[in-house]
Amino acid sequence: MLSDIEIAKQARLKDIRDIAKFLDIPEDMLKPYGRYIAKVDHRYLNTLNAKPNGKLILVTAITPTPAGEGKTTTSIGLSMALNRIGKKSIVTLREPSLGPVFGVKGGAAGGGYSQVLPMEDINLHFTGDIHAVTTAHNLIAAMIDAHINHGNELGIDLRKIYWKRAMDMNDRALREIVIALGGSANGYPREDGFLITAASEIMAVLCLAKDLTDLKRRIGEIVIAQGKNGLVRVKDIQAEGAAAALLKDAINPNLVQTIENTPAFVHGGPFANIAHGTNTLIATKLALKLSDYVVTEAGFAADLGAQKFLDFVAPTGGLFVDAVVIVASIRAMKYHGGVSKDNLNEENVDAVIKGLENLKVHIENMKKYGVPVVVALNRFSTDTEKEIEAVLKNSPAKCVLNEAYAKGSEGAIELAKAVVETIENVPSNYKPLVPSDLPVEQKIELIAKEIYRAGKVIYTDTAKSKLSMLKKNGFGNYPVIIAKTQNSISDDPKKINAPSGYEFTVRDFQISAGAGFVVALAGEIMLMPGLPKAPAAVNIDIDENGEITGLF
């Protein structure tokens, strides 16, 4: 089979204005970036209030192997297949971060015959949204140090500055640094660090904002430090207007197309552990007005991205979820069944059946939200017929084989039919699991016990102290985003399959006041990844004609 980039180069793309015309987007609402990419004015959404929403399909996954289980590929394939069977569909996705593109994971534009295009542009810089977020983030950082240098009127405590610098790259050397060395002209020396842009609260805020006014308000509410009179916010250093100005184009959704010319919005990219892990609300809401079926995905597995989408994102945006698709793979179930990563390509039906427990937990969890569930078994070339049969026979929810990677929409037709049939015959009774008025501790306990299957929640002394501070400052009933490992349902990455009855430990809290949630930290969360020994970057090249190779 050809590589992803070779397949992409064979695709016959339509002019982006034709894609917009298919969606009835007026040309004066379009800002083309070349022939195949365009931004859609976010204000266009306000003109569509009278139109009914389409159906919203949330794609999530079982607890993944390090290589991932093909969530994006499945989302794209499902949307293409829905169009193929006569349903108008749009797929909405997050933008790829350059860090993973050059690191282990590679790009985030799908794969095989299920891609969004042009993949080189989407994976490398795209329309500059992530760079705009980086610049807005670092403007705030620069203004903090300028304020301190010029008298520090707010009495900012140099030991309690929460706002680091940001960069869209994996660079472990920048996690912990010392700045302002070289004399008094350079400011006050202090400890600082970098996080990857996808982990910036600016990214989370961009993905939740309704419009520029809301974006500016949210940026202003971001807590950046402790000062002599309590918490210091961005608005206290008067940086919200300039930061929002840097994002005036980034707030507009990016319209592209799939390999089969299905419309796609690729917009925003917050982490699914430290933040909510899905594309912008503006893009999803616009897609719901322009199509019959919207396919969107949430980061990592159902215990992370889907839980956050169903308990926080959908209520925040006033969204109704009509169905959940859980992406599963034979190799992931073998992994959860005890097979080592080196032996995942060998047939092992017993391990598959044992690993089905992980899938069952995620299905049970999603049904607690009142949404119907369909399982997409993402086929890989190493899967055997016996292994596939074992999953199809033993899955506790409707399970359909998905071959979009190898066959495009043709390989996802049965999945599309199953999803449509489910939506038409099993009405969704979607309701968030976590009531919005509960105190933070009760929200954490509910999520930990119902979704993570923990027996007890314990707090470190640091977490208890920070929780007290949260309550004192009015955050005691805020929505909660739990940041934990993606490699286990639990807070311990070594606990594979379906652990239960364990102690779930909250070690610290962070405030994301602009985004509108508090983050409960469970386990070590890496906000600035590092490159591996053999990064994907070593395989990426460009020739004298500008042809890029090695992207995946």
Curated annotation (Swiss-Prot):
Gene3D superfamilies: Domain 2, N(10)-formyltetrahydrofolate synthetase (3.30.1510.10), Formyltetrahydrofolate synthetase, domain 3 (3.10.410.10), P-loop containing nucleotide triphosphate hydrolases (3.40.50.300). It holds the Pfam family FTHFS. Keywords: ATP-binding, Ligase, Nucleotide-binding, One-carbon metabolism. Its EC number is 6.3.4.3. It catalyses: (6S)-5,6,7,8-tetrahydrofolate + formate + ATP = (6R)-10-formyltetrahydrofolate + ADP + phosphate. The keyword ATP-binding applies. SUPFAM superfamilies: P-loop containing nucleoside triphosphate hydrolases. Pathway: One-carbon metabolism; tetrahydrofolate interconversion. ATP binds at T65, P66, A67, G68, E69, G70, K71, T72. It comes from the Bacteria. GO terms for molecular function: ATP binding; formate-tetrahydrofolate ligase activity. InterPro entries: Formate_THF_ligase, Formate_THF_ligase_CS, P-loop_NTPase. GO terms for biological process: tetrahydrofolate interconversion. The keyword Nucleotide-binding applies. Belongs to the formate--tetrahydrofolate ligase family. This is Formate--tetrahydrofolate ligase. It comes from Fervidobacterium nodosum (strain ATCC 35602 / DSM 5306 / Rt17-B1). The gene is fhs.
